[in-house]
Amino acid sequence: MGLDINILSVPRAVTTKPVDAYIGSRYDANPRWKQVLWWRNDWDLHDLLAMLYHKQGGTKENFNNTTVRLYKRDLRLFDASITAPILEHMKQGRVVYAESSF
């Protein structure tokens, strides 16, 4: 079972369609985005992927073939707290990283 996870930075949230997860916390209380899973603080990518995967019918403990898509223009906004876990999951074969302009 595979899953595409689309991630967007908060600065672009107001001008684009809803995605699976936003990086940042300024829109946490906005009901406009209530259908989106939030991660409010310094987040654990594994937990976020597992929760999204579980929503698609997979198990929280065992997920694979997950494609993480980011906006190319947002890459500079993401610090090591997001890029390092993505790279680690790539090494373990669970995540395929894909730059995207979806």
PLM feature spans:
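Acidic (Asp/Glu-rich) sequence patches and key acidic residues
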Residues: 1-102
